[in-house]
Amino acid sequence: MTFGLIPIALAAQSFQLSRNEGEVKVTGTSTLHDWEEVAEQRNGSMAIDQSGELPSISSLSFTIEAESLKSGHDGMDKNTYKALNTNKYKEIVFKMGEVKSISPVVSTTNKYKVVASGNLTIAGKTNKVDLPFTLTVNDGKAILEGTKPLKMTDFGIEPPKALLGTIKTGDDIEVHYNTIWK
């Protein structure tokens, strides 16, 4: 029986999120202008079994250092950190619970549309979310890319304000991810 289990265990390939390639950014609007912040410090792991007709993702998790979100404007960054309560909550974390769907992209080999369900924790509040992405697996490398709309208030975050409330950030944000895993 032990021999039967070994190939199954070896079929899953582990991937680590590349910190130097790809990008994770958050975009939103305000009464003054649209804005974006890039996550400079992130890490994660993913396990994929490619032995079947479709790949099977057995685990996926990633973490963003909350104070690594950078807009290029110190004042905006400080407002973001205050809204995220980064003195208390240092990380933004996604941990997959299950893959809800996976299907091949017809025109491309090794490319799949995926919806993964899991827990997303921001500013200490955890919500179950569906994370849609396109997964490409080739030559020991995986590319995960997509966009997830969120509302700040769903995580107990009051959209930041500046200049005595005259500049207000919109509640709707989008997380854009184009990540490389090796």
Q: Whereabouts are the PLM-identified features?
A:
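Bacterial Sec-dependent N-terminal signal peptides
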Residues: M1-Q16
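Low-complexity, acidic/polar, glycine-enriched regions of mature
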Residues: A12-K182
